[in-house]
Amino acid sequence: EYEEKHTISELFSKKGELYFRKKERTILETILASDANIVLATGGGTPCFGDTMEFIKSTENTITKYLQSSNELLTQRLFNERLNRPLIAHIQSQELLNDFIRKHLFERSYFYNQCEIKLSTDNLTTAAVIEEINKKISN
């Protein structure tokens, strides 16, 4: 957003998803090329564009994690903030949003299931998620 001087929603509407995904990939390459020790949370579509998941997995000292939530929990979380998310801004009901989420999770599951660590987060606090990830990394 900073570099483009537009919000993600504006980029999607003005330049399209393909432009956004290409820009996102360029920025991802820059971030992963740095020596910084970071935790990077990507959007759900990031690993599904082109060979981005392969690129992430092939980057030295990178561990991929899939924090899995149920369709119902994702629907609850996303419904009230949907206007800030270009792919779901047009969806008017929780039922339609749930259908959209189911479809996208199915389509994206090939990429998500390539993650080295998979963790169901529905009944976990943020602290518990961090603890579980640290346990899995240590093993």
List where the protein language model places each region:
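ATP-dependent small-molecule kinase phosphotransfer cores
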Residues: 1-55, 84
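Short, flexible helix/strand-to-coil boundary loops that buttress conserved ligand/catalytic motifs
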Residues: 4, 24, 32, 60, ...
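Short acidic active-site motifs
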Residues: 27-30, 51, 100, 107, ...
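Short glycine-rich anion-binding loops that position phosphate/pyrophosphate groups of nucleotides
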Residues: 43-47, 70-72, 124
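NTP-dependent small-molecule kinase module
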Residues: 63, 92-93, 106-139
